[in-house]
Amino acid sequence: MLKINKYSLIKNAAVLGVASLSLSLIATSSSFSDGHIYGENNPVTVKGYKGSKTDSTAYTGQMARQLQHNSLKKIVSKGKPSDPTSNTLNKMLNYFENKDKTKSMAILDPKSSSKFPVKQKMVGEISTGSNLAGKADGRVQLSWPNNMTGADVIRFMIKKASKISGGVDMRNGMNYPQLISKYTMGAVLYHQACDNYLDEKMTASNKPNDKPYKKGAYYTGKEHSWDEAFGYWGAAAHTMTLSAQQSYDVAKKKDLKAADFNKDGVVDLYKEMTYGHAYYASAFDRGGKTDYLKTVTKAFIDGRKIITAADGEKLTSSDLTKVHEP
């Protein structure tokens, strides 16, 4: 029996003097333990669906935001405020504010190389409708002055970073690539996963499983909510087949063999890459004292199987208890 006690547990770790969030989830399971790939065997269960889709798994928007986060961090570290032609601020804001509707927003990290070729070159190849700003915590951050929201705080730091070469303010001890990255991981990625999709959207009345997520969708409300939370976690779909070291090396673009699960010679940045919180979990787990990466990923796989097994019907109270602690 799968038991997931709470998805909103956080482990705080200091990374370069900045708080780094690592999602920790407590789960034990004996049933639904045969699958090792996220998204495996998830048929379309929406009643009355007449389209051509056969797989209900979808978290493209979340992977696009993982790439925007990676790219934003990269461009912050390359800022040249002394060069008036560099347009540093607008480039940074582009990766935070905008959606890649025209498939012209270049993926800056990971970039393709001979040792680690990647399938996609533009963010819009995965999703044309995603940005970071629109998903940032909109509540006032009491720890910051002037009633700034989460999105406001990130913009504030971006503006500061645009005025500093390489994004590091040595005089005031501010490493903006790290500050912006870690704050974005919390205010966007973690916030959306744990305070939205695994919280409100796992209650009975919110995005019910007997209805499509939205009109015409090929996935149910609960199926897609769960998938979106998994996307914000940032693990490759085949993470359960990897060691923590391999998952870490995939994030560092050092292990093509481990990343290329389908053996087509390139890394699919939608399903085969390690990002964000899953990357930090991999880093911690390499020492052998923790098992965050597989604990969380396995619980996501098992929870999705419970939702899929409902076959497009409402989740029972027992199902809801398993996937969400009231």
Model regions: which residues?
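Bacterial N-terminal signal peptides
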Residues: A13-S24
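Bacterial Sec-dependent signal peptides at the C-terminal "C-region" and cleavage site
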Residues: L23-S33
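Generic structural signal for short, flexible, solvent-exposed coil/loop and linker residues
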Residues: I10-V15, K215
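N-terminal secretory signal peptides that target proteins for export/translocation
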Residues: M1-I10
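Mature extracytoplasmic or organellar-lumen-exposed domains after removal of signal/transit peptides
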Residues: S31-P326
